[in-house]
Amino acid sequence: MSRFRIQSHGRLQEWVAEEKNYFTEVGLEYEFLVKPIVTWSAGVERVDSSPADIQRGAFESIEDGRGCSLSAACHWTVNMAASAGHGKMWGNVYSVSPSAIFVAPDSPLQSTEDLAGVPITVGYHSGSHYSTLQGLEKFLPRDQIKLHFGGLLLDRLALLVDGQVPAASLFGAPFYVAEQLGCKKLLDTTFMIGHLVSETASRDELEKYFTALRRAQHDIDLEPEAYKHYFLRELPERYHSQIDVRRFGPGERIVFEPYPREVFERTRRWIESWGLFPPEQKGSAGYEIAVV
């Protein structure tokens, strides 16, 4: 049997569980894959222009296969990916990630309503895409919400910091970077994250994995200050001298509660109401098939 493949997900829990040997202690045979920082903006000190829409994101990377036993992504994408047969959604756990729409420190935009007609840079078929729509539809008519698909999370941070876009949706470590660099938060868009499991992962392995993460989550809840340094591993070096990770929050929090049928079905209806997926990407599997 192949080893359970664990990937860093831009959050603290996997790093803490690895540091404390929790995966080993629960008897999980695994390998830890450190996801490299690979973005179109990586390795540059400044971004000088904004790209055209990049219509590729979390869902598309799942379609292609991520090479790990379990993938974390926003619950909208995991919901649709599981329905389309790209894995199964683990129904016993979800996460909640702080997220927000930011503008530059000197932006003339002051209120959420000022975002009407303003292109907000998000990641296509990713948490920022859906959470921006969900958050703004409480303030603006749908036809006044405008999006720009600017690539991955770190790409969006670079575009905002370097003044190439008027607004961007950020979460994880980039959320705290934007705060420390003086960017203004116009709307909180905190969202749920789901977990997609591959066909090669057994229930026993998954239960061991989440047992280890539960212990890590308890450690983070008790003393997040001991682990915030791991955020530097998730950020390009250009930001390291500009920030103090000790001032960061803890980021994503894993909630060890079920992701129920009602939420699954309500999420699907909302996605359909926006027409966010073309027919060739839509799945038809219901909760009883898509969720384990």
Predicted regions and their residues:
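A ligand-binding cleft/hinge motif common to bilobed small-molecule-binding domains
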Residues: A72-A84, L133, V161-C183, R269-W270
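Short, glycine-/small- and polar/acidic-enriched structural segments
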Residues: M1-L133, K138, L186
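Short helix-loop capping/hinge motifs at secondary-structure junctions, enriched
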Residues: P105-E113, P141-R142, T200-E207
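Extracytoplasmic/secreted envelope proteins and their assembly/folding machinery
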Residues: F59, T112, H129, L157, ...
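Pocket-lining segment of extracytoplasmic ligand-binding domains
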Residues: L147-H148, L152-E234
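Secondary-structure end/capping motifs
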Residues: D204-P278
